[in-house]
């Protein structure tokens, strides 16, 4: 029996040509289209077996070099115990070949929008289940987010059972392969033209049955646990960011890997600084005299080594003006330098003045010139044409 002849293709056929030929023949000889036809059933098994081998690069190479008795053939050759020994295997191959067309892992998933899991279908025929991922929230001060910090978290979940090493049974002889599904965890049923796989009712999809369960985990292979996890928080994190710690979630079952731990960051606000990306904003209130004459002012920073820096405020500065102090902002979480410190000037008008202070201001006002207030002059010039009573 030549697999290429069975599918009606040449030995140089591409993977796409192999799949196309198989699909055409599989639909033609499918048992649901040929009920009670033993010859069609035999042909269906043959084309499924041929596709199973030729669609796998390793198996195809072995078949091309050694024939049906190659090293990937299994105990009975490609067509024996390792091939399409029963209709269930042939139907599973059929579903797998058509599943990719619908973006899923099975024909049933593709047709019904990935509802296979809802009906008990499993993509892991050996019953292995990856552990669930966990998520925790961690609160940081503004300074911790700026400088980075090490934290210890207590996480509840499942760990692998130490008594049975996660196997569910201390003695390997206490575990046997499920006879109903032959260790696959699934049984295949034909309904009309369609075939679908469902969870094996005998083993619950595990593919095995534990006859002598471990006393510590009761055959589950894992136990509840609380553990301390060390977390490195890099400098520059912000609220809403998420750190992924691979393998720190719940332990998997039946040899599957553990899930992951996701640490969600919440950063407290700061009484002085406001963050905008990697930049910091500092609102600096100054008196109108300092604004008019200019000054030098010591302002706080987040840098541990300095703690403050000297800012030069130029004379005649206006409220709302932003002065930039480079590299005094937040560190970039990806290590790409630091942001800037943006100092927003807020000129404060004096209140609760004494009579002496008021008199001094009146004296100053009497000496004002138009060039002292260019914005005021510009505004008055603009509205003069509309309101005749406005005077400079």
Curated annotation (Swiss-Prot):
It comes from Chlamydia pneumoniae. CXXCXGXG motif repeats lie at residues 161-168, 178-185, 200-207, 214-221. The J domain is necessary and sufficient to stimulate DnaK ATPase activity. Zinc center 1 plays an important role in the autonomous, DnaK-independent chaperone activity of DnaJ. Zinc center 2 is essential for interaction with DnaK and for DnaJ activity. A zinc finger (CR-type) spans 148-226. Keywords: Chaperone, Cytoplasm, DNA replication, Metal-binding, Repeat, Stress response, Zinc, Zinc-finger. This is Chaperone protein DnaJ. It is found in: Cytoplasm. Homodimer.
């Amino acid at each position: 029996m030549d697999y290429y002849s069975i599918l009606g293709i040449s030995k140089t056929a591409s993977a796409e040509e192999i799949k196309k030929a198989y699909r055409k023949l599989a639909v033609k000889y499918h048992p649901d289209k040929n009920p009670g036809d033993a010859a069609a059933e035999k042909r269906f098994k043959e084309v499924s077996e041929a596709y199973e081998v030729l669609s796998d690069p390793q198996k195809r190479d072995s078949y091309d070099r050694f024939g049906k008795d190659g090293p990937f053939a299994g105990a009975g050759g490609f067509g024996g115990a390792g091939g399409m020994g029963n209709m269930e295997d042939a139907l599973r191959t059929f579903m797998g070949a058509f599943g990719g067309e619908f973006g899923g892992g099975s024909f049933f998933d593709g047709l019904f929008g990935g509802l296979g899991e809802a009906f008990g279908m499993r993509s892991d025929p050996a019953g292995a289940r990856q552990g669930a991922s966990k998520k925790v929230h961690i609160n940081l001060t503004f300074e911790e987010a700026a400088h980075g910090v090490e934290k210890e978290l207590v996480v509840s979940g499942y760990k692998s059972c130490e008594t049975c090493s996660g196997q569910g049974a201390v003695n390997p002889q206490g575990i046997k392969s499920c006879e109903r599904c032959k260790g696959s965890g699934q049984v295949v049923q034909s309904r009309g033209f369609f075939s679908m796989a469902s969870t094996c009712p005998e083993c619950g999809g595990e593919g095995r049955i534990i006859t002598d369960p471990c006393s510590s985990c009761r055959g589950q292979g894992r136990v509840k646990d609380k553990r301390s996890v060390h977390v490195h928080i890099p400098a520059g994190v912000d609220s809403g960011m998420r750190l992924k710690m691979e393998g720190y979630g719940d332990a998997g079952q039946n040899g599957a890997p553990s899930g992951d731990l996701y640490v969600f960051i919440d950063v407290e606000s700061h009484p002085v600084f406001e963050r905008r990306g990697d930049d910091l904003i500092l609102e600096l209130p100054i008196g109108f005299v300092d604004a008019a004459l200019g000054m030098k002012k010591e302002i706080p920073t987040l840098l541990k080594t300095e703690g403050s820096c000297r800012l030069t405020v130029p004379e005649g500065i206006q409220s709302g003006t932003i002065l930039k102090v480079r590299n005094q902002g937040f560190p970039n979480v990806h290590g790409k330098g630091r942001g800037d410190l943006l100092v927003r000037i807020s000129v404060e008008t004096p209140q609760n003045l004494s009579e002496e202070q008021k008199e001094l201001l009146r004296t100053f006002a009497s000496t004002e010139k138009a060039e002292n207030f260019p914005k005021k002059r510009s505004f008055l010039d603009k509205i003069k044409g509309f309101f005749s009573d406005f005077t400079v």
